């Protein structure tokens, strides 16, 4: 019998993906249905519902749920949910009661079928203000919301695609059922998830090792969906993380895996979503460091810590493992945090993924206070293969500029 935390709001995972003959029959039927194009973010949400990562959702949210999530961080039933999971369209021809095929907006591949239970409009500015705490169009999350269609479509879905993630990422891509089976096989009860969209530098390594000390194991969980321009591709990140695990962690304490969502860059609210779906993956804790899921200086460095104190005690079973600002201290001779290092700012080398990418993009060597040499070698090889005209300018803003 499992010792892991149960799925969110349910005794069992709710995987919406069809298999076998049911999948074959539904795919054929879907070819005859009206098509709704999906964005990359929407497709990632569909795949996540397919594998049960968004348990207990059965499809896209209606207006009452959208409003309640924006205003109260709960769906209408009262169940905790921090970010709206919605589907949009400009299609005037589909209406409540219609059945539609949801397709990849670029390839036309059928991803899912849906029975439309509601067609409604939203106040996009309200969603941006409540979820992202800004309406500035420079924010990538605001860009996503403002690019949505005129209408939202709600309804239950049947998922007919895995998005190609298993083929592209092989064993790195694991479903909640698979990670839970892995944890059970290892006999782990407490598992901390480490969310990353970057290769792991020394500060990340330090955070994970703190978690290894207090939990049975750690799942390093990488974003496999779309990121912003200039971020490092998942295959490169995975290789860099693998060499770190092989050389600097004890065997059988770490699982590296990935999940299919796009980043929303919603800072504190996204930290809550990260904890919620990690509960579905079987994790008892989420490591929350500096500026979790943030971008530039839209959020305070520890807003994602504070938001966990603002929700009800029973909102989530997965708890935040909050860790203070970490850095290399020359006087301490190693990694430290604000809680453990008594020295001054002049003695500290503050680390960030943005700062590492900036140095790599500028063809600078990474000091060992920033990165393990094995990791640096992988990243330098990747950046050496990027043509100058294809490089994205990386600016140090907000916390990364310190």
Curated annotation (Swiss-Prot):
Kindly indicate whether the keyword Kinase belongs to this entry.
no
**What cystine linkages occur within this chain?**
none
**GO biological-process terms attached to the record:** hydrogen sulfide biosynthetic process; sulfate assimilation
List the Gene3D superfamilies hit by this protein, alphabetically.
Answer: HUPs, Sulfate adenylyltransferase
Q: Which reaction does it catalyse?
A: sulfate + ATP + H(+) = adenosine 5'-phosphosulfate + diphosphate
What the entry lists under Pfam families is as follows: ATP-sulfurylase, PUA_2
Q: Which stretches are annotated as coiled coil?
A: none
Whether Transport counts among this entry's keywords is no
Source domain of life = Bacteria
- What's its top-level EC category? transferase
Family (UniProt): Belongs to the sulfate adenylyltransferase family.
How is this protein named in the record? Sulfate adenylyltransferase
Question: Which source organism?
Answer: Ruthia magnifica subsp. Calyptogena magnifica
